[in-house]
Curated annotation (Swiss-Prot):
Major location category of this protein: membrane
PROSITE patterns from the UniProt entry: AMINO_ACID_PERMEASE_1 (PS00218)
Protein known as: Amino-acid permease RocC
GO CC terms of this entry: membrane; plasma membrane
Pfam families recorded: AA_permease
Entry membrane topology: Multi-pass membrane protein
Keyword Cell membrane: yes
Lineage of origin: Bacteria, Bacillati, Bacillota, Bacilli, Bacillales
Length: 470
């Protein structure tokens, strides 16, 4: 059962890499979380929030591109933080990110259970969570190739569905398709509310950015998958550039259709706004079909999240920052122990299905969103120090296969803007839980590293691995 070389296998192709990155984004944050963003920021504010969030994501991906092409390792930005920001920071970033995805996997499973209530309301949500949890475990447990192939088709389905939703919804907005019950065509009337363009004020747009960041969580998966991809120096640049623009295209156009049809006061997180929109249009069975597509999308993100978390846990442990038994691989190169423990911890997030579903769901998203912001800040900082060291050691920028443009402006701007997003959590009562939980965890990680990990770690071994990755 064990892979004696203890190495991950490079068996992902270019198409897998691109669809994993794109597919990792399109899930709960868009299909369910967008309802919260609309209700808080208003119609125009929701679109603005996704454009701003997309711009921030663009800055981070430009930084990640340079790092991932120069050092294509499974630990991705955790390895970069360890090398360029310090081992204690790398330890904190890695375990925080692992926790975020473990939490997200549980959220996705809960969301899948919520969607199943449309068809089988008598079956408890936790039953569906268990069933779907077993499914994604089996997909991940077979091999990295089986995971990549399944994720490719998962992602293809939801990308096709988003395009179809935009076409059908756009036609309804402009009167080309009639609404159910003879409702009037809204055109752009829903953009102007009884309280103006921004019903809750301009600041409300900024306050929704944590939720929006949660929606964009997953674009960084391309960096983690680079450690198991063929010819990353060729496939990564193309995948990163494509995923940036296509993600923005899908998110912004989908949000336009949602806010044009759905009054902002009716949006929430218990029912998908996508399903609500298709119900209003009244196309036979379209809402059920969309419900199935959203279910597929959510399981896709859970699948990708389990992959990302297990690889991060394996990377941490292989660098002596976690228990050694987590480094064991199967013959197919799957970190089985890390996979099992991650799925087990994800079960804690199933609390969202049995207690105060809407409140706990938003709390979990806030925590994951906060972790995403911290991780992305570390990517910007790592790229800044990587380029500076690269030049100091006599490197030529033209030798880099992927270059972050406008250095050092891009990493500095990305770091500072995400810092502002973190500070904004202080002013949002519903999302302060992200700080209340996140800050103590960060402090604990640093303290645990210095008190326990630092004295037993072999720094030369870690440095050797990082040097070999370059």
């Amino acid at each position: 059962m064990q892979n004696h070389k203890n190495e991950l296998q490079r068996s992902m192709k270019s198409r897998h890499l691109f669809m994993i990155a794109l597919g990792g984004v399109i899930g709960t944050g868009l299909f369910l979380g967008s309802g919260f963003t609309i209700s808080q920021a208003g119609p125009l504010g929701a679109i603005a929030a996704y454009i701003i969030g997309g711009f921030l994501m663009y800055l981070v991906m430009l930084c990640l591109g340079e790092l991932a092409v120069a050092m294509p390792v499974a630990g991705s930005f955790q390895a970069y933080a360890t090398k360029f920001l310090g081992q204690s920071t790398g330890f904190m970033i890695g375990w925080l990110y692992w926790f975020s995805w473990a939490n997200t996997v549980g959220l996705e499973l809960t969301s899948a259970g919520i969607l199943m209530q449309r068809w089988l309301p008598s079956v408890p949500i936790w039953i569906w969570c268990l069933v779907f949890g077993i499914v994604i475990f089996l997909i991940n447990a077979l091999s990295v190739r089986s995971f990549a192939e399944m994720e490719f088709w998962f992602s293809s389905i939801k990308v096709a569905a988003i395009i179809l939703f935009i076409v059908i919804g756009g036609a309804a907005v402009f009167g080309l398709i009639d609404f159910k019950g003879g409702q009037e065509t809204p055109f752009l009337s829903n953009f102007m509310t009884d309280r103006g363009l921004f019903p809750n004020g301009v600041l409300a747009v900024m306050f929704t950015l944590v939720m929006v960041n949660f929606s964009f969580q997953g674009t960084e998966l391309v960096g983690i998958a680079a450690g198991e991809s063929e010819s990353p120096e060729k496939t990564l640049p193309k995948s990163i550039r494509n995923v940036i623009w296509r993600t923005l295209f899908f998110f912004v156009l989908a949000m336009f259709v949602l806010v044009a049809i759905l009054p902002y006061k009716t949006a929430g997180v218990i029912e998908s706004p996508f399903v609500a929109v298709l119900d209003q249009i009244g196309i036979p069975f379209s809402a059920d079909i969309m419900n199935f597509v959203i279910l597929t999308a959510i399981l896709s993100v859970a699948n990708s999240g389990l992959y990302a978390a297990s690889r991060m846990m394996w990377s941490l442990s292989s660098n002596q920052m976690g228990p050694s038994f987590l480094t064991r691989l199967t013959k197919k190169g799957v970190p089985m122990n890390a996979l099992l423990i991650t799925l087990g911890i994800s079960g804690c997030s199933l609390l969202t299905s049995v207690m105060a579903a809407e409140t706990v769901y938003l709390w979990c998203i806030s925590i994951s969103g906060m972790v995403t912001v911290v991780a992305w800040m570390s990517i910007c900082a790592s790229q800044f120090f990587f380029r500076r060291r690269f030049l100091a050691e006599g490197g030529n920028v033209n030798d880099l296969e992927f270059r972050t443009p406008l250095y050092p402006l891009v990493p500095i701007l990305g770091f500072c803007l995400y810092g502002c997003v973190l500070i904004s959590l202080i002013f949002i009562p519903d999302q302060r839980i992200g700080l209340y939980c996140g800050v103590p965890i960060i402090i604990f990680c640093y303290a645990y590293y210095h008190l326990s990990i630092k004295k037993r770690i072999n720094h030369e071994t870690i440095e050797k691995k990082q040097t070999e990755a370059q």
